[in-house]
């Protein structure tokens, strides 16, 4: 029997359909889902079916952390049914093929499966790799199997071990220092902490920003037949008196001093790699984790190529004309027709070129009827980006004019899209057109209106998910496969609110303490160094053991520094957490409102002045509370979110929520009467 192992059940189903020509049937192997045809069984895993962990003797959080980080780690099954199914199938197998995703994680998952198989039967194991789940790609891969890349898998093992050791040690230290144990623990990690520091640092700059007023002068002008808008050449006036004097000096007419018209070439975008794709999806309002989940589903179903890639250069073997030709019918027919009319299709090229996977591109034609709305939105983004990379540059007509009105210099700029080029296919990149008529030097135009507008300087914007992922990529924080997961984890742990990314008080407290006493943890340099070393495992330059030991030595020094400052760190964290637990001001006595617990263990918003003041508001019995930085405009109380599992729901203002509940009860009683 030929056993084929895939990374997920949906991938197993797809590969079985392709290889069997649709003749495969669903079955169970020791309770695990599988697909059978002829003498072949395709079994899907659930990602990693084993994990690294510390042995039971190190589960106590009172364990000395220096001992913990040097303790041996053990492999623990996480999906016992699938492990049992894999072992059962291995007994009957005379050939095993690993068909997991071709990246570091996929190679490690494949090695994990191979190890389980070999523990049952010493059978031959080969490896297939593909970048698209299309019949052509999958069948080609199975015609030319290779071996598991042990160096690539070992790199994944090293990352697992390093992340476990750093995460466990730092999380235990921070949580015990803050006296936050159980479900209320505070997490930290080698990638998580510097990423959170970026978000906190941006929030700090926003809080420290002091707005300054400035004034701008806007002028409406007209020729004999057309109108246009201009600004004062000074742009921003820092002094109101100067701005007032300037606008009063502008007369009823203005004379054209210079006029220039030029054409600007607007190059098409580069092919999508993971980072650019997530940034583009984020701009459409799709969270990074949601975008990646959707892209993975599209890949597994055969609609797009593998979405985890650093590559921004299409490989020579990709037939661009054939890829466009499949869209000659359907919703993108006109786009395809325009591209196919070109004598030669030449794609743009980005700076990053790798040999594992191509950039993300469509592999099958879909219609809206084939996909649910979210999947279609992502699929359309990928298709349109692909078309844009094969298109001509857009062209803009740029016009610039300077004018003089009684010695005051004015200016205006016009921008018109003269040739749409790639922008026809990719409407997401919006640039506002501004009309400016053709003028000539010495021409006199009429001033029809002038306006002095007061504005103020604005603080830097909070990170969007796409922007942060680009910054993480630039700083070497995480990998293309993990960056969106890091952001998701920060939200789940109560460290950030999303869209845009805004740190909670807990996040600020933890980051501030780490920055003060162990800045190495919050800086990207250490993490980037470890990532570079793990990349060297892939090439065989370094061993997994060397990298793990090197990382552990760094962590040992960090922990020693933290130990020396334990009392100060504990005090800093607890003070910060107390401030974060404040909901608002008590309307009865003006003391702080905090989250309290009753004698029976129930929680509520209560006055810190208890027992003198007994004001209180109810809270949900279950779920993890997150007190956000946003406040109710009516009651000046901080809004609360409740985490249930991996999802959050808005409780809102405790006072508003309670008042609404009281009103509903009154209405229900009246209806009953």
Indicate residue ranges for each PLM-predicted region.
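Structured, non-catalytic alpha/beta "coupling" segments that mediate domain-domain communication
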Residues: 27-55, 193-238, 387-434, 606-608
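N-terminal cationic and glycine-rich segments that engage phosphates or anionic surfaces
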Residues: 273
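Intrinsically disordered, low-complexity regulatory segments
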Residues: 1-166
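Phosphate-interacting basic helix/loop segments used at nucleotide- and nucleic-acid interfaces
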Residues: 72-96, 198-199, 280, 381-387, ...
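Basic, low-complexity terminal or inter-domain segments flanking catalytic cores
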Residues: 2-3, 39, 116, 171, ...
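C-terminal or mid-to-C-terminal helical accessory/interaction module adjacent to the motor/catalytic core
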Residues: 133-216, 261-262
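Metal- or metallocofactor-binding catalytic centers and their adjacent structured scaffolds
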Residues: 161, 238-270, 278, 443
């Amino acid at each position: 029997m030929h056993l084929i192992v895939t990374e997920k059940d949906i991938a197993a189903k797809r590969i079985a359909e392709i290889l069997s020509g649709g003749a495969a049937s669903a079955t169970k192997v020791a309770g695990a889902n599988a697909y059978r045809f002829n003498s072949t069984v395709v079994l899907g895993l659930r990602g990693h079916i084993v994990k690294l962990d510390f042995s039971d003797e190190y589960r106590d959080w009172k364990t000395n952390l220096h001992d913990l980080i040097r303790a041996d780690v053990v492999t623990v099954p996480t999906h016992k049914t699938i492990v049992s199914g894999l072992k059962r199938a291995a007994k009957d197998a005379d050939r095993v093929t690993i068909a997991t995703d071709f990246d570091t994680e996929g190679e490690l998952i494949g090695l994990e499966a191979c190890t389980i198989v070999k523990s049952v039967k010493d059978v031959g194991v080969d490896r297939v790799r593909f970048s698209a789940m299309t019949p052509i790609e999958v069948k080609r891969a199975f015609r030319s199997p290779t071996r598991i890349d042990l160096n690539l898998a070992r790199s994944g093992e090293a990352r697992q071990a390093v992340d476990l050791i750093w995460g466990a040690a730092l999380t235990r230290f921070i949580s015990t220092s803050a006296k936050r144990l159980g479900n209320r623990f505070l997490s930290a990690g080698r990638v998580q902490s510097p990423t959170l520091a970026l978000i906190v640092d941006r929030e700090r700059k926003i809080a420290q920003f002091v707005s300054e007023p400035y004034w701008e002068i806007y002028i409406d002008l007209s020729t004999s037949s057309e109108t246009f808008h201009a600004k004062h050449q000074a742009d921003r006036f820092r002094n109101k008196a100067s701005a007032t004097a300037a606008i009063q000096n502008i007369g009823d007419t203005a004379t054209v001093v210079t006029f220039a018209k030029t054409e600007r070439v607007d190059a098409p975008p580069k092919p999508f790699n993971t980072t650019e794709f997530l940034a583009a999806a984020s701009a459409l309002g799709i969270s990074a984790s949601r975008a990646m989940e959707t892209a993975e589903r599209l890949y597994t179903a055969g609609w797009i190529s593998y979405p985890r890639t650093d590559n921004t250069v299409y490989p020579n073997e990709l037939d661009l004309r054939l890829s466009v030709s499949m869209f000659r019918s359907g919703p993108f027919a006109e786009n395809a027709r325009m591209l196919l009319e070109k004598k030669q299709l030449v794609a743009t090229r980005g700076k990053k070129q790798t040999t594992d996977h191509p950039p993300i591109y469509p592999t099958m034609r879909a219609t809206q009827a084939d996909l649910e709305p979210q999947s279609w939105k992502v699929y359309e983004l990928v298709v349109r980006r692909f078309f844009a990379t094969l298109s001509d540059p857009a062209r803009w007509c740029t016009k610039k004019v300077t004018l003089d009105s009684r010695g005051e210099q004015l200016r205006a700029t016009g921008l018109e899209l003269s040739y749409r080029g790639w922008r026809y296919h990719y409407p997401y990149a919006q640039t506002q057109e501004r009309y400016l008529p053709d003028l000539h030097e010495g021409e006199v135009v009429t001033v029809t209106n002038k306006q002095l507008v007061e504005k103020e300087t604005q603080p830097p914007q909070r990170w969007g998910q796409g922007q942060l992922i680009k910054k993480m990529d630039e700083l070497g924080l995480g990998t293309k496969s993990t960056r969106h997961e890091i952001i998701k984890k920060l939200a789940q742990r109560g460290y950030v609110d999303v869209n845009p990314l805004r740190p909670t008080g807990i996040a600020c407290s933890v980051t501030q303490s780490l920055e003060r006493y162990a800045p190495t943890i919050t800086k990207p340099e250490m993490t980037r160094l470890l990532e570079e070393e793990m990349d060297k495992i892939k090439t065989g330059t370094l061993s997994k053991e060397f990298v793990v030991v090197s990382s552990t030595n760094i962590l040992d020094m960090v922990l020693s520094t933290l130990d020396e400052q334990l009392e100060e760190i504990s005090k800093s964290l607890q003070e910060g957490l107390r401030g974060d637990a404040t909901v608002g001001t008590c309307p009865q006595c003006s003391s702080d409102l905090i989250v309290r617990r009753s004698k029976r263990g129930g929680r509520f918003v209560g006055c810190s002045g208890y027992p003198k003041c007994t004001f209180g508001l109810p809270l949900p019995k279950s779920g993890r509370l997150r007190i956000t930085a946003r406040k109710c405009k009516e009651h000046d109380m901080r809004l609360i979110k409740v985490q249930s599992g991996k999802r959050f729901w808005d409780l809102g203002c405790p006072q508003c929520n309670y008042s609404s509940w009281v009103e509903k009860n009154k209405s229900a009683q009246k209806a009953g009467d």
